[in-house]
C-alpha cells in the first residue's frame, strides 16, 4: 500500500514538472512597451530592426487593442504624477507601413492580411524606420499612439504596387 501511495505521489509530481506554464499577465502595459522600444532603438542594422518588428507584431496578436481608457486611482498623500507612474494602462505599440501619400496599419487583429504584407517587407524595400514617442505619437495617432508608434517608410513604387495587390 505504501508503494502504491508513493508511486501515485511521484507520478503526480512528475506531471506538474511537465505542465505548461500558465500565463497570468493578460495585459500589455506601457512600461513593457517602453522597455521594448528602448531595446529596439539600440539595434544598429535595418534587417535586425525589421525582424524585431515582425516578431513584436506577431507576439502582440494575443492582445486586443482596448477602446476604454486607463483608470488612475489617486491614494492619500500621492501626487497625480506618482499615480500615473503606478497605473497599469493597457496599450499596444502602433506599427505602420508608410509611403509618400498613404500609410497602412500593421495590426493582424484589425487587418487579417497583415501577415501577407509582412512577408513582403524586407530591408531592401524599407528606406527608413522611425520611432515616435510621447506627444508626437499621440498627436498623429491619437490615444492609440500613447505607447509609441513605429513607422517603416518606403519610397519604392514597385513595393507599393505589391502591397496594393495584396490588399
Residue ranges and their predicted role:
Residues 1-25:
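Bacterial Sec-dependent N-terminal signal peptides
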Residues 20-167:
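Short, small/polar-rich motifs associated with maturation and membrane association
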Amino acid at each position: 500500500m505504501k508503494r502504491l501511495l508513493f508511486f501515485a505521489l511521484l507520478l503526480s509530481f512528475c506531471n506538474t514538472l511537465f505542465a505548461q506554464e500558465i500565463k497570468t499577465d493578460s495585459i500589455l502595459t506601457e512600461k513593457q512597451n517602453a522597455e521594448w522600444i528602448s531595446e529596439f532603438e539600440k539595434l544598429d542594422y535595418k534587417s535586425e530592426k525589421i525582424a524585431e518588428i515582425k516578431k513584436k507584431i506577431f507576439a502582440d496578436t494575443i492582445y486586443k487593442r482596448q477602446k476604454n481608457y486607463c483608470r488612475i486611482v489617486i491614494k492619500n498623500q500621492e501626487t497625480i504624477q506618482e499615480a500615473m507612474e503606478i497605473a497599469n494602462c493597457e496599450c499596444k505599440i502602433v506599427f505602420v507601413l508608410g509611403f509618400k501619400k498613404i500609410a497602412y496599419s500593421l495590426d493582424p487583429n484589425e487587418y487579417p492580411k497583415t501577415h501577407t504584407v509582412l512577408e513582403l517587407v524586407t530591408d531592401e524595400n524599407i528606406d527608413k524606420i522611425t520611432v515616435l514617442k510621447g506627444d508626437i505619437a499621440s498627436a498623429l495617432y491619437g490615444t492609440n499612439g500613447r505607447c509609441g508608434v513605429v513607422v517603416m517608410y518606403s519610397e519604392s513604387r514597385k513595393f507599393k504596387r505589391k502591397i496594393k495587390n495584396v490588399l
